[in-house]
Structures are given as C-alpha cells and as structure tokens.
Amino acid sequence: MELTLENEALRISAWVREAEGNAPWILFIHGLGSCKNNHAVLLPAAMMVRQGYSVMLLDMREHGASSRINQLHTAGQEELHDVLNGWRWIHEKKGIPAEEIGVYGVSLGAGTVALAFAEEPRIHAAWLDSPFADMEKIIRSELQIAGFPAFLAGGAKFAGLLFSGIDIMGRTPLEGAESIGNRHLFIAHGKQDERIPVFHGELMCETANAFMLEDGSVECWYPSGQVTVGEDKTTGHAVAMLTELEEWNHQMKEFFGRTLNHQ
C-alpha cells in the first residue's frame, strides 16, 4: 500500500499485516540505507505478529519503494513526518485508539521515532533500538574515526542547509526522552556498538528517567554481542535481536503487552 503526505508530493510505501479481532498495532521503522524488507524490522515484526498484533512496516522517504527526490536524508528532521503519517493512518483510518498503538525504530529509525514521539503526544509507547541522542555527536564521532578533526561537524550542518535547506542538527532525539511524561519508552543499545556508541542509549535513558511522570515508564537494556558481516569484520550495531533472540522476543512481548494492554 502507499500513504500520501499532506502538503508534500511524496508517496510512502508500506506493508500491513492485520491480526484477527481487535488487536493493538505496532509501526516499524527501519534504519539508514535500509528499508522495510530488512531483517532489523522484519524479524521483530514477525515476533509481534506471532503474539497477535497487527503491524505496519514502512519505507521512509528516500528509502526502499518510497519517493526519492534528492537521495538525501535529514537525520529524522523530515522523516519524522513519515512516521507520523503511518501512525495517523492506523489511528484515524483504522480507528485504533492511541493507547493501542506502539512504534518501533532501529538506528536512524529509532532517532526518527524519538523525534515523532516528541512531536505527537498521543504516541503511547515506543521501542528504540540503538538510537542516536544527538546528530552532532554522531558526526563528530564519525569524523574522529575517519581521522578528521571533530570541528568539521559544522561543515556537515552547512552542507545539509545548502543541499536540502534542512538543519540536520536542528532537533535531537533527546526531545523525545524529555517529552515522555506519562508515556512509555524501551531503549535497547548494544555495549559493543561501534556505529552509534552505547553512551547515546544511556543518555536517552537517563534523560527519559529524569523527565518521566508517575504513570510513565522507562526500560533500558544494554546487551553485549557482535556478529560477523564479512571475512574479517564484525559489528555490534543493532544486532541484539540476533545475538539475544529469545530474550529480545521476551522483552518485546512484555513491554508491548504491558503498555498496549495486550496479554
């Protein structure tokens, strides 16, 4: 299926799998350079289908089968509208109460979900796998890994403004943690993540706990583990669903079961 965005000439490609009866829904958002048919969203979505949930997986703009305008991403600044469009389709078109809709994001998708969480106060529960807390910190880290001085991060901001007109550092996913209130967040981040260091997840967790109100909840999990992605290369980025498969399934079942009232 395709979603269209108001005031934007964009088509957002999505897959939907509806459960029988009045089941809660979960919206799944992929990472950078990925799409809805990647294991990072397909696997957890399949886990939740087996638990009786309805699910939507969508391709953010410039990814997968969705509209491609300039082959650029904006670190969630614009992509958050794709997430909100998917969420509103479930809420408004399918008539699902807000408290029965969860959102799941991985990597760039996790940061984007956090921005959407800040933008839309009706999003009831969100799972963030390997989120970035601040894009400037990510760019500085990538520059240092590549052997360049961190102050060049300002150039990335300028390039974003020049080519897309968007400040990719304008809003940070920390806004999502700060806006938690009486809502619910689960933050999972691998200790051996070399792409988005674990301190990003820890900062999101600390911030959410500081701003959480009485009826809200924050759960944080920092598993270890890496997988081989080549003859001589390993990665610890967003791999816990593979290295901790049974525990991942259990944690998702418990979190969404509790927060979306689906036991």
Regions found by a protein language model. Give the residues of each.
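N-terminal cap/lid segment of alpha/beta-hydrolase-fold proteins
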Residues: 1-21
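Hydrolase active-site cap/lid region
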Residues: 115-166
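Alpha/beta-hydrolase active-site loop
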Residues: 73-94
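Alpha/beta-hydrolase fold nucleophile elbow
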Residues: 95-106
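Conserved alpha/beta-hydrolase
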Residues: 45-67
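C-terminal catalytic histidine-bearing segment of alpha/beta-hydrolase fold enzymes
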Residues: 202, 210-263
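Short beta-strand/loop motif that positions the catalytic acidic residue
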Residues: 180-181, 187-189, 193
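Conserved alpha/beta-hydrolase "acid-adjacent" motif
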Residues: 194-200
